[in-house]
């Protein structure tokens, strides 16, 4: 029997809550869940008792690491909320969430305004065309300033922020807000956790300013909306409903970003924020169709939210759940899916059975019989599905746009403390890498060491912590290693010839390959330019494979060789002795022979480092950047502090948090994200080669 949809599509909202670390994002989500009736007791991040942060390390560190998906209800709407981490090491979690959201709430700290990590998540949201509203939080905090925060959106994000409210008071005088659309004031009751307020006339001393801002707001809307512009120019009255509808249209087109004020911790402004989510953020019907391709014809297909269409969903997160084991979060783009039915994982071309479907409430779950288009839910029973896989109706296979994940930039060796821990560690690493595509675990074939790599020191700390807590694995950790790469800088043509005659069947493979440097980031490209069968067809894939295997261990110091074009253009073969294996070896010999003439270099990851310090420490900090082979890319004033933008090699950034803390007496902060790879200076390259026992190259 078919189940019926509880909430129509137009009354569904899939939203993310994004922010800089410490802007109060998790507390805001908590309050939303509290007021929508999902939580009976409020947990403070300060006490480590928050509903959304359900992993132990998140509660200890007071930061959100994994995006828990939670369902809430507000004024007849279903709101699926994805809580996203605000720490730079977890930007992949943010991207992963943005892929499946329709709209987002950006939370700012009312004292700091737009901070470096806000810029990162804002840029990511813009890449995915996600409409946003902004909540200026912590208005009760010392130094909070609503107008400063709104201006920081214009200046630092170049975004058209539209304040729909004015704050009544600030810091410990923050009493409520003026609604510039309704032209009313909401003043909070001091005694009952802010869950009740009085709707009153705008305070006399704010009336004139409120009217001025109301006018300015209508002008801003008219600038981006023709209907309002027409009425405005004709001098006709614009009703509140018309104004709201126009703000919604402009928000969905990313022409405007409505801004609201409040203090989640003091329970002020959260209900108005919820109203804004319903009024201004998109339903699955409002967003542009989702791109997919037909795996047989490569024809582009556009998916719309429609329950009658064939089922198509994206697995956007795999988690090991303490209660139900392996849990796959899915976003349904079209069609419906009943628990117990089969789906096709079209990415891996495997049929899978969905055992149970769960609606997630941060740490408690409700079993549901069916999911519909536009829904976000958890599925149990998908054994082969990993993050970014497409799940479709077995009779209508589709490939949804897959996710791109950055390569890890930092690596450490881990070894189990006891033999008994070895198997447990392998299981733990396998599960953790299934959950997180930017975390990789591998064994060094030469040393037998287990190496884990990730996006930063905090990222790996948390992985190691989870091994200990969730999988009870005790491990020793080595010093962090940088994920260097190798590349060619010159074009060269070389021969690789492998001949072995030792009685019986011999081995014979002979190739001529032209190697050319590829654009940075373009990776490896292989071209078959063989004419006249000088290398038989069946051996050409072996040449390609042989090159890729040899490139994995580089030519200078054992790091992967990247960004190279290889053109196989000549060679020879032996009727009896040639084999796939012989041509694989010949290809790897060609790569080795290219070292002398292709100008190989070692590339190192360069990080974008933004350092915020009080002015009096500026000179010292800039000296530190230069001493670490960094380049200062500019500075800007932030209140009485300075933001230094710089690019620094990752190898020079280990332990920098401690250095900065002592150099600025604990007042400096920095964020660091991977930016690009570039060649190391000659002296550094020589050191790396020596340390790794590699082969120095003669100039």
Curated annotation (Swiss-Prot):
SMART domains: EFG_C, EFG_IV. One of its GO terms (cellular component) is cytoplasm. GTP binds at residues 19-26, 83-87, 137-140. The keyword Nucleotide-binding applies. Disulfide bonds: none annotated. InterPro entries: EF-G-like_DII, EFG_II, EFG_III, EFG_III/V, EFG_IV, EFG_V, EFG_V-like, G_TR_CS. Its main location: cytoplasm. The keyword Nucleotide-binding applies. GO terms for molecular function: GTP binding; GTPase activity; translation elongation factor activity. Gene3D superfamilies: 3.30.230.10, 3.30.70.240, Elongation Factor G (Translational Gtpase), domain 3, P-loop containing nucleotide triphosphate hydrolases, Translation factors. GO terms for biological process: ribosome disassembly. It is found in: Cytoplasm. Pfam families: EF-G_D2 (PF22042), EFG_C (PF00679), EFG_III (PF14492), EFG_IV (PF03764), GTP_EFTU (PF00009). Keywords: Cytoplasm, Elongation factor, GTP-binding, Nucleotide-binding, Protein biosynthesis. Residues 10-285 form the tr-type G domain. SUPFAM superfamilies: EF-G C-terminal domain-like (SSF54980), P-loop containing nucleoside triphosphate hydrolases (SSF52540), Ribosomal protein S5 domain 2-like (SSF54211), Translation proteins (SSF50447). PANTHER family: RIBOSOME-RELEASING FACTOR 2, MITOCHONDRIAL, TRANSLATION ELONGATION FACTOR G-RELATED. Catalyzes the GTP-dependent ribosomal translocation step during translation elongation. During this step, the ribosome changes from the pre-translocational (PRE) to the post-translocational (POST) state as the newly formed A-site-bound peptidyl-tRNA and P-site-bound deacylated tRNA move to the P and E sites, respectively. Catalyzes the coordinated movement of the two tRNA molecules, the mRNA and conformational changes in the ribosome. Belongs to the TRAFAC class translation factor GTPase superfamily. Classic translation factor GTPase family. EF-G/EF-2 subfamily. This is Elongation factor G. It comes from Levilactobacillus brevis (strain ATCC 367 / BCRC 12310 / CIP 105137 / JCM 1170 / LMG 11437 / NCIMB 947 / NCTC 947) (Lactobacillus brevis). The gene is fusA.
